[in-house]
Amino acid sequence: MDKNCFEKITLAKGEVNLYDFGGMKLHAYRTNDFLADEVFVVEKDGQAVVIESPCFFDNDRELEGYIAGTGLAVAGLLLAYHMAGGGFLPGVKRYATRQADEYGHRGGGKALIDSFTDAFGAAFDNAVHQVTDYVEPGEVTIGGIRFNIIPTHEAFDVEIPEIEAVYTHMLGHDCHSIVAGAAHAGAMIGRLKGFLAKGYRLVLTSHYTPEDLKDVETKIAYLEALTEIASGCAGADSFKAAVKERYGNYGGENYLDMTARFFFG
């Protein structure tokens, strides 16, 4: 599946890129919110599973309306890295690992929710999803759709074997990512090299449109360069300046700021 082979559906605020795999469909919802969030609806035989949640109230309502218009029955939400948006799809089961639940309620995910609440105020749905069903690493079937839960340091990635796709938190071949120091960069590189070995057709992330393995290779090179640059810098300011010089066309400068604090905080 070519990452550019989709039907574009324009909504009032966001948009959906619809990928048709024959027996399954993938609805990639671009929220167009302040955080460039993406949410994914996996469809098979009239049922759907939503991967991650919108976190602004207007996006909650927009995606709910879109799903209702498709006539799909939502079997559950898979919540990994984005636990905000608790008002989305009330009454639908929430699936997560215990580690992801901890990350979203008391760990780094909750710290981000608190920060975004301060930044965005009443527009931000800061209610934390209450997990109804815990899943373990390995294969799980929800709504007749097979997933493979792959634990990570913070939460978990989601493999979708039937469409040869994987969901992870961040990639973005031309934008900065949150990198929590050299060890985290190394772990990310290892995980991305695993994607190459698996030969996924699509890589889905929380903050970018669907990407492919060429984009994965680009990101690996970026992470390796980031670590090299950090090793030669004395502080956050010189680090950011050096990264911007090499990657001047990259977006997500706020993520670079966060990365600099992790490396030099």
Language-model regions, residue ranges each:
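Accessory terminal helices/loops
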Residues: 2, 103, 197-199, 209-265
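Active-site-proximal beta-strand/loop segments in catalytic clefts of secreted hydrolases
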Residues: 31-32, 45, 52-54, 78-83, ...
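Conserved beta-strand hairpin/beta-sheet module of binuclear metal-dependent hydrolase folds
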Residues: 10-66, 156-170
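Active-site environment of divalent metal-dependent phosphoester hydrolases
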Residues: 35-36, 57-59, 79-88, 101-104, ...
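Metallo-beta-lactamase
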Residues: 3-16, 55, 105-226
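Stable alpha-helical elements in mature extracytoplasmic
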Residues: 59, 63, 85, 112, ...
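Active-site metal-binding motif and surrounding structural segment of the metallo-beta-lactamase
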Residues: 46-48, 56-100, 199
